Amino acid sequence: MTSIKHLLINAKKYDQKEFEIKAWVASNRGNTNIRFVEINDGSTIKNLQVVIKKEIMSFLEVDKIRLGAAIHVKGVLKYTPGMAQEIELNADKFILLKNTDEDFPIQKKETSLEALREIPHLRHRTTTLRAIMLIRSTLALEIHKFYNERGYLWVSSPIITGNDGEGAGESFVVDDESKDFFFNKKATLGVTGQLHAEAYALGFSKVYTFAPTFRAENSNTTKHAAEFWMMEPEVAFFDLKDLIKMSDDMLRQVIKRTVEAHPHEFEFFEKNKPGLLKNLNLFLNNKLSILEYREAIKILEKVKDRFEDKNIFFGKDLATEHEKYLAEKHIQGPVAVINYPKSFKAFYMFQNEDNETVAAYDLLVPGIGEVIGGSKRETRYEKLVQRVKDLKINQEDLQWYLDLRRFGQASSAGFGLGFERLIMYITGTENIRDTIPFPRTPKNMKM
């Protein structure tokens, strides 16, 4: 059994050869002499047109086949370059394996993405969601490839944890409904795998985590979800410069290979969002620039009237509109903004000599703004302990992490990549709910 994608890639070579496919019906049309049934097996967004003649199957039976029905077809492939259908299959055998009921909600008439979110178990059978999920799968594979090729260890970070790595306190508590704690202490769903990755970098040198993370943040924006995936590499002996280069190399390779692997899908995305490929090429074809946070503030202050948020000052966390301006208008390419004020950054970031900023960066790209945030880690035990105290974080829960500084952690650096944010960026998807198979958001969990 072969796939439709494989047939498309090898169309010329397979002309006039016989193939057998099992798939689902995407459309059913024709006239009194011939029927055309388009099928899709999920390997690509492109459908395969099956040509059915009367002697193969009664047209009365063909007409009963509804969208979404499972079929089994055997026939001869015909290569038709220059036609609307690059290939078609002339059926010798066409079998209906399972029809759909009349109330099957996926029909030829386009359904809004908002309506499709009500049927997460079926929406991937539409062209849009199929395209996004194909890209999601390839992106994940390419991320693993990038780190595997460079000798990184993949660490399975825990889902259940006893500490809040971000210090934000927006965690889901794990409760077994008994009077006593199951783990003899308060347990939460992890908001990051970074702290555990740091422990493993101290011994394996180069590691990364790629796992679901959870935030109990009551935010109903297009960019937030309660459950999402994070990819977090951590490298011993790296400084900020090394980290920025590695993150830039990773993004370029992963995006380039994914786009190359899915020509039909990206043709579809570009049609839905003109200019998408231009923004991707702005990133791929331009060298990464480095910009000090202080300098970024000065640049933004000069053009503040163009922003909705005009209140720009040193110590402000940049909004998306500010980030997009820096990447799209000022730099016209990717830019890493470095050395942010420590006032709004995490406790574990290395404090610079000015005692006002930390060795942190955000990587901004045209079209979306921030895709990566990272830092060199604070490895001076006394400074880290003081920072924990200043932020009123429970030191007892983090003592194991603090102790890494006493047990050979000379230096370390790492970043976090919101996986769904990356999918949104390269597919032009505007709502994070459409990049996750089964999204979890406030007051909403369908399955």
From Swiss-Prot:
Keywords attached to this entry: Aminoacyl-tRNA synthetase, ATP-binding, Cytoplasm, Ligase, Nucleotide-binding, Protein biosynthesis
Top-level lineage group: Bacteria
User: Known SUPFAM superfamilies for this protein?
Assistant: Class II aaRS and biotin synthetases, Nucleic acid-binding proteins
Q: Which GO terms describe its cellular component?
A: cytoplasm
Catalytic activity from the UniProt record: tRNA(Asn) + L-asparagine + ATP = L-asparaginyl-tRNA(Asn) + AMP + diphosphate + H(+)
Q: Which GO terms describe its molecular function?
A: asparagine-tRNA ligase activity; ATP binding; nucleic acid binding
- Kindly list the places in or outside the cell where this protein is found, as annotated in its UniProt entry: Cytoplasm
Where is this protein chiefly located?
Answer: cytoplasm
Gene Ontology biological process: asparaginyl-tRNA aminoacylation
Q: What is its EC number?
A: 6.1.1.22
Q: Which PROSITE patterns match?
A: AA_TRNA_LIGASE_II
- Top-level EC class as recorded in UniProt: ligase
Q: How does it assemble?
A: Homodimer.
PANTHER family tied to this protein: ASPARAGINE--TRNA LIGASE, MITOCHONDRIAL-RELATED, ASPARTYL/LYSYL-TRNA SYNTHETASE
Similarity remark: Belongs to the class-II aminoacyl-tRNA synthetase family.
Any idea what this protein is called? Asparagine--tRNA ligase
Native source species: Mycoplasma mobile (strain ATCC 43663 / 163K / NCTC 11711)
